[in-house]
Amino acid sequence: MNFNLLNKVIAGIVFIISFIVLFMTVQPSVSFWDCGEFIAASVSLQVPHPPGTPFFLLIGNIFSKLPIGENLGFRVNMISVISSALSILLLYLIAVKLIENYKGKKADNMFDAIATYVSAAIGALAFSFSDTFWFNGVEAEVYAFSTFLFAAVTYLIIRWNERADNKDSEKYILMIAYLVGLATGVHLMSVLAAVPVVMIIMFRKYVNDEESLKKTGYIFLGHIVIILLLAVFWWSSQKSQTAPTLEEYKDFDTKFKLFIAGISALIMGVYWKKIFTRNSFYMPLIIGGIALFATYPGVVKYLPELMTAIAGDNIVTEIIILALLFAGLGYGVHYSRKESKPTLHLVFMSFIFILVGFMTFAMVIIRSNQNPPMDENDPDTFTELVKYLNREQYGDFPTFKRRFATEPHQQIVYTGYSSDLDFFYTYQMNHMMTRYLLWNFAGR
């Protein structure tokens, strides 16, 4: 029997089931939260709240013109329905790939095929009808579309892993880079995929000593445990019942980050001969972190800031700077190919594709200059665009000390916790995160 065909049939069934249920439960018009804002912004290509979702709005504008239903809200809501159903399709295919990789072979008999495909289908459909995913899949929010982009990136890197030795395998990496660039115009959640993508590439192409990988993996595990234990001890000592000032917030955050960096530097310094090698578990993490940093905040925040610092609000100069950047990257592509440096060539090409995807943010400044009815923060110059991208209107918020509230009616709450750690565990973890997680599997 052709098990590949059976796999495709079940994948299609999973997609159809998910799509039908989501379609039957989709919001018929405008729902709560930011949905009305996104629908209105999509229909007329307006400027919503920072940091903007230009790629989502472009897709929403297309959907608003489709002859499906009479309600514009319903049309834009269908983005989430379709992207969520596609996410479930990709999740099924990913699960099949992972099961086959774990077994070390594809299904070669009916029992194996049923066990693999049915297990993957159950997992995918369970996710489809979980509280969070289902809720996001029936309204015009960015999370469903962002989940689809994340799923697409995950599926593409698995496909690349299977074909990494082929001459044209880099096309999967370039497609991933483009999707990551586009994802900046939807939600930054998908940008996080840059780290595991780079790690998989490193493990597949550069790591050739599994024993060294395991040893450094144990070092990394011990590294994390030491930091967590010391952090818990320090955090539990923060028992003040008086709200700190803004300067004290920032001072604690700075000390905490320096503490983590110092402990990390000490551990990595002791084991530097094992850590800074191609077969180290640390290297894929470090390079993956660099790739993430290059995308966000690198491309998303620092590139517009740099362009504004050089050219101010002169749009012609800004375009020239951007053209020079692409020219420099183009030369890097030419040089790396001429000198037969495939890794460097792939890095330059990937960065170009990320930049091209990020260019959807040009819509923000273009539409703001048209003065649409919804023009939040009025980002019609590069100076204002930088503020828009940096979300400056929201101000700063502490990274760690979040027990205290500024609202008078909430200030009495933080006295009910013995320490910052007590607040973190009792409220943030147990009440908020665990309860929310169980909504997906135990119901509300």
Regions found by a protein language model. Name each.
Residues M1-V21, L86, M110-A121, I275-Y282, ...:
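Start-transfer (signal-anchor) and selected internal transmembrane alpha helices
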Residues N4-F32, F127-F129, L229-V232, F293-P297, ...:
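Transmembrane signal-anchor helices characteristic of membrane glycosylation enzymes that use polyprenol
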Residues V9, L91-F129, A164-K167, K171:
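Transmembrane-helix signature of polytopic, membrane-embedded enzymes
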Residues G12, M78-D108, A152-L156:
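Transmembrane-helix motifs of polytopic, lipid-linked glycan transferases
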Residues T25, L66-N77, Y102-A113, G123-T147, ...:
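Aromatic- and kink-enriched transmembrane "portal" helix at the membrane-lumen/periplasm boundary
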Residues V43, L90-I94, F133, F145-D165, ...:
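Specific aromatic-rich, kink-prone transmembrane helix
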Residues A107-I114, V153-Y172, I201-S212, G269-N279:
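Membrane-interface transmembrane helices that cradle and orient dolichyl/undecaprenyl
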Residues V118-A121, L156, R163-G181, E211-I226, ...:
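Short hydrophobic alpha-helices at membrane interfaces in multi-pass membrane enzymes
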